[in-house]
Amino acid sequence: MSDIYSQVVKKSDMTDITLNEFKNKVLLIVNVASECGLTYQYEALQGLYNKYNEDGLEILGFPCNQFGAQEPGSNEEIKFFCTEKYDVSFGLFDKIDVNGDSTAPIYQFLKKDNPSESGSNDIEWNFTKFLVSRDGEIIKRFGPKTEPEEIKKDIEELLNV
């Protein structure tokens, strides 16, 4: 787990990719859920993606069912929901665990030196966001209630726009 680009993740179709595919991009990595009170954030996340993708922003959504069982669907059902309801075109990945013994390696890496505002390394709820610079540095962890629009300035600074 030397750097973020060596991380291997599964796309929603279960094919493996390394995050090296996103080298030199600004990344916003989010654990997502379809039946959460914060699910509406998909719309604003897609808005950020539409506005900044050409400038180098990639959004990586990792469905997770660990918080109130709010992501019960299969990868196909999740993708259908996101595209039909929110017109999501950013990357959606395989459903994972973000806490506990079966935490996905990408989230072990993200949480390691980036505690929440309360000081916990655990992900506290759906829609926790990690902002990663073009050189792979984790810039900031944002809590679930941080609206995507509130991250806009940080994204613009990293993209130099």
Language model features with spans:
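Chalcogenol-based redox active-site neighborhoods
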Residues: 1-161
